[in-house]
Structure formats: structure tokens, C-alpha cells
Amino acid sequence: MTDQIRMAQASAGMNLSDSVYERLLRERIIFLGTQVDDEIANKLCAQILLLSAEDPTRDISLYINSPGGSVTAGMAIYDTMKYSPCDIATYGMGLAASMGQFLLSGGTKGKRFALPHARIMMHQPSAGVGGTAADIAIQAEQFAQTKREMAELIAEHTGQSFEQITKDSDRDRWFTAQQAKEYGIVDHVIESAQGPLSN
């Protein structure tokens, strides 16, 4: 078998973007560049677990450019970040909204970054409800619990009070990178990578 055939077989079913993400993964860089759903959450959780198993002492860098999405899928990513023995450095770029903002602020303290033109948006979680009156009441109770839990966690990560987070997230609250730093969502605004892109 020639080298060309081997290379063609190795790359079969893999497009250019797949090979870029594979290369980034080898550098301990993972990327959330879509809406948060179960599929991307499972992929990111698996990547965090893999990198944690390979070397539990080295940082993992999570780059976020996401409009948000599913609360349960996002919480799976968040819990895996906290479960990992590795520090998770988070980088907000482009847009980190809703669950994207939550994951950005949930990175390891001191290692949460925003690029200068990133926009960050915080708001309360939203959910569609339906069914019988009893079902709707149960869903409303679950939703209120989720809203409270997320506000408590954001308060813990930002240093803001629970009351302030509840007030500020009642409607869409937009931040520039610098405003996000002042609020406590990120620790640093960075314009260029100093040294390797991963920590």
C-alpha cells in the first residue's frame, strides 16, 4: 500500500475543519463554536475527560463563541469542567451569550479571558412549557429552581451578590470585554497570545 493511499484512508470522512479541531485537541485546546446542545455537550465532556486522563496536571483551554442554548447540556459541560482535576482556562471570543457566558465565567479563577471585541450577554434561563396544568406547574417549579441555582453559581464566580445577579439577568444584560472584567465574569482582557495558545 502506498503512502498516498494510507493518507487518503486516514483522512476519509474527515474534512479540513475536523483535522484542525483534532490538532487543537492535541494542544489541549477545545472549542465551543455553536449553540449548546446535547451533541456538542457530549463531545466537549468527552474531550475534557480524555485530556484529564492524559495529564491531570496540565491546563485545558476552552474557547467559547456561542449564543448559548440548552441549560441541561450546558450544565453537563459545567459539571465536567468542575469534575476535572485540570484547571480549565476559558476564552470568550465573538459572542459568549447565555449558557456561553455561564461557561465563560465558570472557568478557573484567574484563568478566565476575553478577547477585546468579544461581547458577553447574561440573562435568565428560558424554557418552553406545555402539557396539562399539573405538568406546567411541575415544569415551572423546576425552572424556578434552575434559575435560582444558576444565579447562585454566577454570583459565586463573579463576586456579585445573588440579588445583583438576579436583577441584572432579569433582561438581556450586555457587556463589552472590559465591562465583563469589571463585573467579574472574566479576569483578563487579552489582545494577543503570549507564549503558547494553550496553558
Swiss-Prot record:
It comes from the Bacteria. The keyword Metal-binding does not apply. It is an enzyme of class 3 (hydrolase). It is found in: Cytoplasm. It catalyses: Hydrolysis of proteins to small peptides in the presence of ATP and magnesium. alpha-casein is the usual test substrate. In the absence of ATP, only oligopeptides shorter than five residues are hydrolyzed (such as succinyl-Leu-Tyr-|-NHMec, and Leu-Tyr-Leu-|-Tyr-Trp, in which cleavage of the -Tyr-|-Leu- and -Tyr-|-Trp bonds also occurs). SUPFAM superfamilies: ClpP/crotonase. GO terms for biological process: protein quality control for misfolded or incompletely synthesized proteins. The keyword DNA damage does not apply. The active site is at S98, H123. GO terms for molecular function: ATP-dependent peptidase activity; ATPase binding; serine-type endopeptidase activity. CDD domains: S14_ClpP_2. Fourteen ClpP subunits assemble into 2 heptameric rings which stack back to back to give a disk-like structure with a central cavity, resembling the structure of eukaryotic proteasomes. Cleaves peptides in various proteins in a process that requires ATP hydrolysis. Has a chymotrypsin-like activity. Plays a major role in the degradation of misfolded proteins. This is ATP-dependent Clp protease proteolytic subunit 2.
